[in-house]
């Protein structure tokens, strides 16, 4: 909706006022376009959830905790550690939208490929099937890194600072409702259809939904940005020590995400713990998925109230606190019954939503339009624990116990609160 009706707009002669009207109209247009993408991406997120859908698929194929760790390392860690490569390339481009769309279409291809692979799964050797699944996950994760940097940069340029917090909260609210409804669909598919047909249908639908989601980005009006002097990877690598030394916000942010991310990367191992203690049926997978997304939906209401008073740092504090408590609670509840243990996934929904809102929000507040792509690449590449922890955790669980990993993870996650307090977000 225009700020003023056409009859009034033609009477405006002040160039500054004209610019304000155009900027406000573009902001509203982009706000809606981003929400369109967020809505359909939320549907997709449920269908390809790493914590439940992917992890259970690996276990169904015949994998172990080690394979779950490898999967998590690829799906969560690979996009982060490859960001620097893409950040240098993208920093040399004034417009990021074409590269954002390319990254998303590669993700559509990988999901469709996953569906085809599972369509012929019964004729495939389990080892080859596992390897092929990991290849598709690798393509999905890498193209996600390419798209993710572009997304963050465009979001920073397309929405004024005054609109970003409202957008991120609105995005999570819409996403939570969408994910909750799609969780019911995925739960039904997992239970009603036999393996591997259920997973095949899930990934084909996910590919179609992600394709529809790109419509929002086609509609975005992207303003051209400046070309960063750090537009080549070698220059970026050489500049990292200087950037970290001169920007304490960035260095503390990197330490924050390294410590707090363990709260997210440990979640897939709750599925492995469930299989070890209670078995793993389609009914269980469906219930875990549903409880996780119910938690995400309900938590959005709480995060909105916290954001209004304490901003993104308040949400990040809750993210670290709950993320640190959950592994210990999982160990306790795993010694009871599945009726109690399944609520771990409900509370993991709180952790996931808090992480998505706060980590992205804090990055927006400590960066500018000129350095955002580079900072996203640096922080992602230096998120070493996100990539390495799942691999080490999987091996330790195979060799020792779940207690070894979970008890180690909790204090590390709690330590992120120290780095959070040292970050100065711009008002």
Predicted features and spans:
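Membrane-helix interface/capping residues of multi-pass secondary transporters
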Residues: 65, 95-96, 130, 161, ...
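Structural signature of the two symmetry-related core transmembrane helices
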Residues: 98-116, 314-329, 410
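Helix-loop boundary and gating motifs at the non-cytosolic
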Residues: 2-81, 90, 112, 249-289
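C-terminal transmembrane helical hairpin of 12-TM major facilitator-type secondary transporters
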Residues: 314-356
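Helix-loop junctions at membrane interfaces in 12-TM secondary transporters
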Residues: 116-134, 332-344
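MFS-fold secondary transporters
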Residues: 113-117, 121, 140, 217, ...
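Helix-loop junctions on the cytosolic side of multi-pass membrane transporters
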Residues: 214-231, 421-427
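Substrate-agnostic recognition of the 12-TM MFS/MFS-like secondary transporter fold
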Residues: 33-52, 71-91, 98, 103-108, ...
């Amino acid at each position: 909706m225009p700020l003023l009706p056409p009859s009034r707009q033609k009477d405006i002669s002040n160039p500054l006022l004209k610019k304000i009207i155009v900027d406000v109209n573009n902001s509203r247009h982009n706000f809606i376009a981003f929400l369109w993408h967020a809505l359909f991406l939320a549907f997709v997120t449920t269908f390809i959830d790493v914590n439940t859908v992917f992890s259970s698929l690996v276990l169904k194929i015949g994998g172990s905790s080690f394979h779950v760790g490898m999967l998590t390392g690829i799906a969560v860690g690979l996009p982060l550690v490859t960001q620097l490569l893409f950040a240098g390339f993208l920093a040399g481009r004034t417009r990021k939208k074409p590269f954002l769309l390319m990254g998303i279409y590669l993700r559509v291809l990988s999901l469709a490929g996953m569906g085809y692979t599972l369509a012929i799964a019964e004729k495939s050797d389990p080892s080859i099937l596992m390897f092929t699944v990991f290849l598709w996950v690798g393509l999905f994760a890498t193209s996600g890194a390419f798209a993710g940097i572009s997304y963050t940069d465009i979001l920073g340029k397309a929405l004024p600072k005054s609109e970003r917090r409202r957008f991120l909260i609105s995005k999570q609210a819409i996403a939570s409702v969408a994910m909750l409804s799609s969780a019911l669909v995925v739960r039904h598919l997992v239970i009603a259809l036999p393996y591997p047909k259920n997973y095949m249908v899930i990934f084909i639908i996910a590919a179609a939904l992600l394709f529809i989601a790109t419509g929002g980005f086609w509609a975005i009006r992207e303003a051209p940005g400046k070309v960063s002097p750090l537009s080549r990877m070698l220059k970026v690598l050489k500049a990292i020590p200087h950037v970290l030394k001169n920007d304490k916000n960035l260095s503390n942010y990197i330490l924050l995400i390294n410590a707090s991310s363990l709260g997210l990367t440990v979640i897939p191992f709750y599925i492995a713990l469930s299989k070890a203690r209670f078995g793993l049926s389609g009914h269980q997978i469906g219930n875990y998925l549903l409880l996780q997304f119910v938690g995400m939906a309900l938590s959005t209401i709480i995060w909105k109230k916290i954001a209004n008073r304490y901003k993104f740092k308040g949400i990040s504090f809750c993210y670290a606190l709950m993320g640190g408590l959950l592994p210990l609670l999982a160990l306790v509840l795993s010694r009871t019954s599945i009726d109690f243990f399944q609520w771990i996934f409900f509370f993991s929904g709180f952790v996931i939503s808090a992480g998505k809102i706060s980590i992205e929000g804090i990055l927006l507040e400590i960066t500018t339009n000129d350095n955002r792509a580079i900072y996203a690449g640096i922080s992602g590449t230096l998120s070493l624990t996100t990539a390495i922890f799942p691999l080490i955790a999987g091996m330790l669980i195979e060799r020792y116990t779940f207690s070894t990993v979970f008890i180690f993870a909790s204090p590390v996650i709690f330590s992120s609160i120290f780095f959070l307090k040292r970050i100065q977000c711009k008002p």
